[in-house]
């Protein structure tokens, strides 16, 4: 750590999208309290469109009354790394983050997939918030009037990591040995969260797990096979009991569990990988 660096107020753990579609949520681990503070700030970044000047002017007029668009501004800039001089650019701000890609595709179609080049479409609002504010995950930060400022550059290699709290997490099926394939209707008999092991019938056990995780508020749940078994089985049994994502909350934000990518099987020289 730079000896001259300012003492941080905390560490930026992450920036996520807000459910309202117009903001991002900043998660900061406070230095003084050790707790994680959630703060939402409005942030709707534009994506950029380049093309012939007259086509950009026509596009700006067409987008002015489009309900999917919050704002359109003409600028001069160098959106590409290969641009040696500024050129006309149209900055398009989607009304909601979820409309970003569909709006970009519609604009591309208006140009016959030839006239326009689009930039920053594939970057999410949290990614662009990091870039625009000089932030990065786990950055030590100070809060200056609601603006987070990193006290160390992203290129720093000698720095103190945030003091993350870790809790061991394990799910056990009643009457089954861990590691074996459970029966389709296997009931959860016990769940370990940190130093606490919870047991009992599922309709009491699963709400107790939510309560214990909220009480302990760990930054990391450390499990062996969590992605392949623990979490999917927990959510499966919660759904069987009628506990939706608004009631069965294992994180700091109520979100539904979904696979990051669909399951697939690959064959290579007769072996299933």
State where each predicted segment sits.
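The two-metal-ion catalytic cores of nucleic-acid processing enzymes
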Residues: 1-273
């Amino acid at each position: 750590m730079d000896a001259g660096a300012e003492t941080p107020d905390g560490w930026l753990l992450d920036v996520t999208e807000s459910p309202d579609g117009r903001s991002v949520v900043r998660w900061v681990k406070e230095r003084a309290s050790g707790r994680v503070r959630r703060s939402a700030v409005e942030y709707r970044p534009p994506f950029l469109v380049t093309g012939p000047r007259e086509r950009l002017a026509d596009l700006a007029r067409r987008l002015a009354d489009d309900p999917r668009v919050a704002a359109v501004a003409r600028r001069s800039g160098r959106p590409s790394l290969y641009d040696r001089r500024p050129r006309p650019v149209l900055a398009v701000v989607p009304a909601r983050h979820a409309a970003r890609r569909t709006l970009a595709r519609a604009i591309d179609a208006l140009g016959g997939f030839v006239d326009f080049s689009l930039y920053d479409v594939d970057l999410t609002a949290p990614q662009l918030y990091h870039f625009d504010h000089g932030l990065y995950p786990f950055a030590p930060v100070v809060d200056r009037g609601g603006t987070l400022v990193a006290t160390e550059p992203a290129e720093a290699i000698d720095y103190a990591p945030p003091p993350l709290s870790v809790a061991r997490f394990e799910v056990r099926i009643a009457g089954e040995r861990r590691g074996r394939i459970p029966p389709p209707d296997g009931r959860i008999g016990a769940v370990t969260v940190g130093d606490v092991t919870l047991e009992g019938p599922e309709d009491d056990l699963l709400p107790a797990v939510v309560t214990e995780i909220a009480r302990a508020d760990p930054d990391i749940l450390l499990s062996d096979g969590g992605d392949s078994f623990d979490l999917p089985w927990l959510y499966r049994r919660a759904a069987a009991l009628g506990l939706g994502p608004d009631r069965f909350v294992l994180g700091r934000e109520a979100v539904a569990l979904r696979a990051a990518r669909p399951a697939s099987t690959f064959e290579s020289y007769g072996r299933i990988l």
